[in-house]
């Protein structure tokens, strides 16, 4: 480096250091100004007082400083908005049903990342709606998924995941060990009823606010089971329908009232009308209504009306257009107080909504298999009337496509409960031509609005040939 370059380099370094020093000085000045202003806002300074000397012949002056600093500390407490128990509300008016969510779980499972499930349902809290399902402890197309056609194994558990999403590793929460379940939100906390154990000695564990709070033991020792859809809560008391006993003979049916996770009472469902009842789909329309499955004698569906104290009414949906599967061709018998005794068993989980004397019924399009899905409105179908007529038919899944269970759920919306339902779209070993070792499902959901709906077809849509075996 020649002398000129050295001089230039030294000059540049000197200028840089000077600039840094200047910036530090300016920053220090600003900092001190701000600090003094804050101290001025928050302290009271008593200026020095001069005290005369105590010792004679001494020229010293004693200066006493009395500094008092007052710090004003403001504490802000953020409290969560107080939650209230869900009230009793009527159903919102509706004229048809509109697509809400579709999870496409089987199509998305082509790469084996999707959890094998069945018996799905939907339930909502104050903020979100959630999908629930009974998982099989296996991923689609893996070796552990072979044989997942079985209903009850110790590997099944109730899981929850965001509605409209497929159940994959990373987006689900395991709730409890269960091969039968029901869930509901009381306005403050979630409650889950989870059945598991040996067929002849099962128990139901009640989970409330994430803690196990109570249990129900099998009393008939014959597959204790519950709704496979949401229970319902009014003013903090939740109502759950439970069955124990044969699937195709006389069984025991109970309604349990549970508050904050504790059983407060139960009643036996009277057998004067209902011969068999399981897998109820319940909703609130001031009282709790449950539309259920008769797996023994009825292709018409049994129902109950319940409040927070007792079972108020029971019967069978009167409509001559039946909604279980299998069922006779339309029209069939009108039977309001007993099962139809026509194509009575086995059956499939389903739902209905009462609107005055009319009734909306979901059902498979096929009369003898789980394919297709439609919802019909039967004028005066809730009562014994000669005027039963299908005034509305919405075909939502064509008869060329597989369906399965269906059930109701409700969403609080502007002072009433919006009626909604889901359709389980089963794929796998239960279906002819589905040449795979597993059984699983996707779902599609619909909600009612007081508008005229359009039309469409919303099947599972997966090409089974693309799927892992």
UniProtKB/Swiss-Prot annotation:
Assigned keywords, A-Z: Calcium, Disulfide bond, Glycoprotein, Glycosidase, Host cell membrane, Host membrane, Hydrolase, Membrane, Metal-binding, Signal-anchor, Transmembrane, Transmembrane helix, Virion
What's a GO cellular component annotated to this UniProt protein? membrane
**What does the entry report regarding how activity is regulated?**
Inhibited by the neuraminidase inhibitors zanamivir (Relenza) and oseltamivir (Tamiflu). These drugs interfere with the release of progeny virus from infected cells and are effective against all influenza strains. Resistance to neuraminidase inhibitors is quite rare.
The record ties this protein, via SUPFAM superfamilies, to: Sialidases
State where Ca(2+) binds: 294, 298, 324
User: What segment(s) does the record annotate as region Involved in apical transport and lipid raft association?
Assistant: 11-33
User: Could you tell me which residues belong to the region Hypervariable stalk region?
Assistant: 36-88
Q: How does it sit in the membrane?
A: Single-pass type II membrane protein
Region labeled Head of neuraminidase — which residues? 91-469
Name the needed cofactors: Ca(2+)
Q: Which residues catalyse the reaction?
A: 151, 405
Does this UniProt record's set of keywords contain Transmembrane?
Answer: yes
Q: Which residues lie on this side of the membrane: Intravirion?
A: 1-6
Residues modified by carbohydrate are 57, 66, 72, 146, 308
* Gene3D superfamilies from the UniProt entry: 2.120.10.10
Virion surface side: which ranges?
30-469
Which Cys-Cys disulfides exist here? 92-416, 124-129, 184-231, 233-238, 280-292, 282-290, 318-336, 420-447
Please state what class of enzyme this protein is: hydrolase
What Gene Ontology terms for biological process does this UniProt record contain? carbohydrate metabolic process; viral budding from plasma membrane
Which residues of this UniProt protein bind substrate? 118, 152, 278-279, 293, 370
Q: Which family does it belong to?
A: Belongs to the glycosyl hydrolase 34 family.
Cited function: Catalyzes the removal of terminal sialic acid residues from viral and cellular glycoconjugates. Cleaves off the terminal sialic acids on the glycosylated HA during virus budding to facilitate virus release. Additionally helps virus spread through the circulation by further removing sialic acids from the cell surface. These cleavages prevent self-aggregation and ensure the efficient spread of the progeny virus from cell to cell. Otherwise, infection would be limited to one round of replication.
| Other remarks on this protein | The influenza A genome consist of 8 RNA segments. Genetic variation of hemagglutinin and/or neuraminidase genes results in the emergence of new influenza strains. The mechanism of variation can be the result of point mutations or the result of genetic reassortment between segments of two different strains.
**Annotated protein name in UniProt:** Neuraminidase
Classification from the root reads: Viruses, Riboviria, Orthornavirae, Negarnaviricota, Polyploviricotina
């Amino acid at each position: 480096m020649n002398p000129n370059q050295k001089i230039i380099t030294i000059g540049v370094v000197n200028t840089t250091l000077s600039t840094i020093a200047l910036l530090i000085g300016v920053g220090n000045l600003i900092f001190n100004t701000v600090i003094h202003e804050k101290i001025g806002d928050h302290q009271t300074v008593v200026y020095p007082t001069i005290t005369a000397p105590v010792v004679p012949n001494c020229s010293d002056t004693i200066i006493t400083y009395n500094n008092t600093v007052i710090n004003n500390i403001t504490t802000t407490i953020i409290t969560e908005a107080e939650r209230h128990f869900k009230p009793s509300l009527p159903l919102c008016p509706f004229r048809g049903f509109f697509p809400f969510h579709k999870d496409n779980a089987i199509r998305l499972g082509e790469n084996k990342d999707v959890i094998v499930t069945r018996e799905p349902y939907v339930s909502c809290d104050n903020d979100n709606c959630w999908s629930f399902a009974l998982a099989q402890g296996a991923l689609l197309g893996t070796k552990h998924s072979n044989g997942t056609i079985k209903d009850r194994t110790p590997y099944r558990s109730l899981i929850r995941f965001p509605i409209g999403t497929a159940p994959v590793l990373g987006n689900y929460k395991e709730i409890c060990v269960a091969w039968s379940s029901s869930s509901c939100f009381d306005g403050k906390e979630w409650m889950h009823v989870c059945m598991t154990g040996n067929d002849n000695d099962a128990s139901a564990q009640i989970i409330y606010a994430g803690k196990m709070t109570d249990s129900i033991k099998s009393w008939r020792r014959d597959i204790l089971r519950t709704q496979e859809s949401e229970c319902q809560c009014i003013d903090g008391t939740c109502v759950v329908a439970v069955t124990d006993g044969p699937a195709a003979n006389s069984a025991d049916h109970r309604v349990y009232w549970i508050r904050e996770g504790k059983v407060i009472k139960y009643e036996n469902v009277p057998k004067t009308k209902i011969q068999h009842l399981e897998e109820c789909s319940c909703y609130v329309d001031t009282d709790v209504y449950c539309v259920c499955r008769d797996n023994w004698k009825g292709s018409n569906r049994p129902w109950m009306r319940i409040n927070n104290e007792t079972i108020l009414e029971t019967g069978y949906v009167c409509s001559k257009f039946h909604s279980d599967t299998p069922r006779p061709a339309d029209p069939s018998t009108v039977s309001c107080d007993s099962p139809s005794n026509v194509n009575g068993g086995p059956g499939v989980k389903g739902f209905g909504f009462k609107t005055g004397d009319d009734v909306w019924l979901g059902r498979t399009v096929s009369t003898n298999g789980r394919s297709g899905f439609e919802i019909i409105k039967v004028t005066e179908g809730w009562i014994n009337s000669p005027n039963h007529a299908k005034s509305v038919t919405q075909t939502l899944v064509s008869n060329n496509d597989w369906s399965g269970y269906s059930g109701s759920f409700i969403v609080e919306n502007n002072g009433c409960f919006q009626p909604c339902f889901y359709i389980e779209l089963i794929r796998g070993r239960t279906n002819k031509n589905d040449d795979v070792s597993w059984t699983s499902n996707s779902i599609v959901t619909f909600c009612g609005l007081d508008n005229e709906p359009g039309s469409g077809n919303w099947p599972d849509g997966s090409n089974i040939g693309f799927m892992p075996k």
